[in-house]
From Swiss-Prot:
<dbReference type="GO" id="GO:0015850">
    <property type="term" value="P:organic hydroxy compound transport"/>
</dbReference>
<feature type="transmembrane region" description="Helical">
    <location>
        <begin position="190"/>
        <end position="210"/>
    </location>
</feature>
<feature type="topological domain" description="Cytoplasmic">
    <location>
        <begin position="435"/>
        <end position="448"/>
    </location>
</feature>
<dbReference type="GO" id="GO:0015203">
    <property type="term" value="F:polyamine transmembrane transporter activity"/>
</dbReference>
<keyword id="KW-1133">Transmembrane helix</keyword>
<keyword id="KW-0813">Transport</keyword>
<feature type="transmembrane region" description="Helical">
    <location>
        <begin position="363"/>
        <end position="383"/>
    </location>
</feature>
<dbReference type="InterPro" id="IPR011701">
    <property type="entry name" value="MFS"/>
</dbReference>
<dbReference type="GO" id="GO:0022857">
    <property type="term" value="F:transmembrane transporter activity"/>
</dbReference>
<feature type="topological domain" description="Extracellular">
    <location>
        <begin position="125"/>
        <end position="130"/>
    </location>
</feature>
<dbReference type="Pfam" id="PF07690">
    <property type="entry name" value="MFS_1"/>
</dbReference>
<dbReference type="GO" id="GO:0000324">
    <property type="term" value="C:fungal-type vacuole"/>
</dbReference>
<feature type="topological domain" description="Cytoplasmic">
    <location>
        <begin position="566"/>
        <end position="586"/>
    </location>
</feature>
<feature type="topological domain" description="Cytoplasmic">
    <location>
        <begin position="499"/>
        <end position="508"/>
    </location>
</feature>
<feature type="topological domain" description="Extracellular">
    <location>
        <begin position="530"/>
        <end position="544"/>
    </location>
</feature>
<feature type="transmembrane region" description="Helical">
    <location>
        <begin position="545"/>
        <end position="565"/>
    </location>
</feature>
<protein>
    <recommendedName>
        <fullName>Protein HOL1</fullName>
    </recommendedName>
</protein>
Length: 586
């Protein structure tokens, strides 16, 4: 039993990994097969099964094809969620739809993104990942069509609700799909591309929509989205492979840590009291009064996280483990099936659906979820502010920008976001591995937070340069550099938020991202309604000084989390394990 890979081990701490095999794991053999590792000796986490249908065993081209589709979904939904501004002048002039109504539509969009993420998430655990992409793309197509035909205020508001729902699949489902096909040590780089795609859609979407509106008319902003949504929907239906795979049913190299016997095709646990065995593992460290963990944490404090007596933790009964090496690759029609029923689906899954909703909401009790949500959410708030400032200030003297000039202001922000993604993603992957090598191979989730230092300095500096520069009419070069700094903080913070949370609770990726999306988009919704009033009441310069202070303050939360993060993960371990067992036992 290895404490870094087996969550039943009494010394297991979520978010603490050993990038190299420990002595126990190196000697652990099942069917004469050692643990799977990279060519450089990094242990693959999670350990793949022997089945050709395991997404972790997909060929490189299959992974790249799926990754490319997920990247396009992310970029496209981000773009459609930010393109309405290109049509607001025309809607105001032709139909008298006020700018306040457009802001209301933006607020509704954020609510649609955040809360539909929660209500759609259980479908991924019941009917596979693919169905959510189909539902979201279909609703996005409908929202774009409604916007293309908009003539009334209600059209501009309610169409944005459907557009927001369409982006919800990129808030949590995409990350889940990517974690299905990539290993732990690859997620930093993968998330970098994810955040870059979000950046491209967020910053280039308004630019492209502006050109479409200028060269045709504002309705084509919606019609182009309809056309692309239709093509994307067809691609998803016929080309998107399902990544749901119940690895718990299959033998992996880690099953060498279990007692069992070989019967030719299966491995069956010889201990028929799986529940009591798991209880012994959990209670050994977690239920002993005054038991002390690493850094002197009193584990008895976790008692407050115990499940109520009337709420049973359902753990699947002991079952035979399948030797996946004897399976054949599924035929293509089954690999792209619209629905892939979960192995634990009961009937139509109505009761399970509401149980999954409850489990998702449990993640609000985990401090790293709040840190991730605030990191991501506050950057979206700044996005709202500087886009509003661009639209309200730069059409007027002394700037006198055209629609194209204002749209071009998104380019330096995009460049900064790409650099931030690379810094917090690819560079951080090498950095955390370097840190782990100097820590006896032990990788802590908090290593990712080192890169918050750059965000805490560069982000506020960018807000000050843009805000004060706009108010005092500085040269455009200083203002554009400020926008680049803001973009850097946007990309860097997003990457840190996603990677840190996925490292902290690797078996609850979807649930964590759902709560992060709710926090993020609820914060964004609130500030969408207050942005214009704040700028009008305090003025551009004072508003951006306040935003810079808020940026630094929220980013500074990374410091106590770095020092106390492992203690918090240990403190929430029992609740985490119970949540995983509840989900897997639904």
């Amino acid at each position: 039993m290895d404490k870094y890979t087996n969550r039943d081990h009494p010394d297991y701490i979520p978010g603490t990994f050993n990038i190299y095999s420990s002595q126990n794991l190196e000697n652990g053999i099942i069917y004469e097969s050692k643990l799977k590792k990279t060519s450089s000796g990094v242990v693959l986490i999670p350990q793949p099964s022997y089945s050709p249908n395991d997404p972790l065993n997909w060929s490189s081209w299959r992974k790249l094809a799926h990754f490319g589709l997920m990247a396009f979904i992310t970029a496209f939904t981000a773009a459609t969620s930010n393109d309405a501004g290109a049509a607001q002048d025309s809607l105001n002039e032709i139909y008298g739809i006020s700018y306040d109504s457009m802001n209301t539509g933006a607020g509704v969009l954020f609510l649609g993104i955040g809360w539909s993420t929660l209500f759609l998430a259980p479908f991924a655990n019941l009917y596979g990942r693919k169905i959510t992409y189909i539902v979201c793309t279909t609703l996005g197509l409908f929202g774009a069509l409604w916007f293309a035909l908009a003539k009334r205020t209600s059209d501009t508001i309610w169409s944005q609700l459907f557009v927001g729902i369409s982006e919800s699949c990129a808030e949590a489902q995409v990350q889940l799909s990517l974690s299905d096909i990539f290993f732990q040590h690859q997620l930093g780089s993968v998330l970098t591309v994810y955040i870059m795609c979000t950046s491209i859609g967020t910053f280039l979407g308004p630019l492209i929509a502006g050109y479409i509106s200028a060269f045709t008319n504002f309705r084509w902003v919606g019609w182009v989205a309809v056309i692309i949504s239709g093509g994307l929907l067809i691609t998803i239906i016929f080309g998107c492979e399902e990544t749901y795979f119940d690895r718990g049913q299959y033998m992996t190299p880690l099953t060498s840590c279990q007692s069992g016997y070989e019967d030719g095709t299966t491995l069956q646990n010889s201990d028929n009291t799986a529940v009591s065995r798991r209880k012994r593992h959990l209670d050994a460290k977690l239920s002993t009064p005054g038991a002390m963990g690493e850094k002197g944490v009193d584990l008895s404090e976790t008692a407050e996280f115990e499940v109520n007596n009337e709420e049973e933790v359902t753990i699947p009964e002991t079952r035979e483990l399948i030797d996946g090496s004897k399976e054949h690759l599924k035929p293509y029609p089954k690999r792209v099936a619209i629905l892939t029923k979960a192995t634990n689906l009961k009937g139509y899954g109505f009761k399970q659906y509401f149980k999954y909703l409850k489990i998702n909401l449990r993640m609000f009790l985990f401090p790293p979820v709040w840190l991730s949500g605030m990191f991501w959410g506050i950057q979206d708030v700044f996005l709202t502010f500087y886009l509003t400032t661009q639209e309200s200030a730069y059409y007027e003297p002394p700037w006198n920008y055209s629609d194209f000039g204002v749209a071009i202001m998104n380019v330096p922000t995009l460049i900064g976001a790409v650099i931030g993604c690379i810094c917090a993603g690819i560079v951080s992957d090498y950095f955390v591995l370097w840190m782990a090598r100097h820590n006896r191979g032990i990788l802590e989730a908090e290593f990712r937070l080192y890169f918050s230092i750059a965000t805490a300095i560069i982000g506020p500096a960018g807000l000050l340069m843009f805000g004060i520069g706009t108010a005092r009419q500085w040269p455009w070069q200083a203002i554009y550099v400020g926008l680049g700094f803001v973009g850097f903080a946007w990309g860097c913070s997003g990457d840190i938020a996603m990677a840190y949370l996925m490292d902290c609770y690797p078996d609850m990726v979807l649930e964590g991202m759902v709560c992060t999306a709710i926090i993020n988009n609820t914060i964004s919704c609130i500030f969408t309604f207050t942005c214009s009033d704040w700028l009008a009441a305090s003025g551009t310069e004072n508003t951006y000084i306040a935003l810079a202070v808020i940026n630094f303050g929220i980013t500074a939360f990374a410091l106590p989390m770095y020092y106390y993060g492992k203690r918090i993960r240990l403190w929430t371990k029992r609740w985490y394990l119970q949540s995983v067992n509840l989900r897997d036992g639904v």
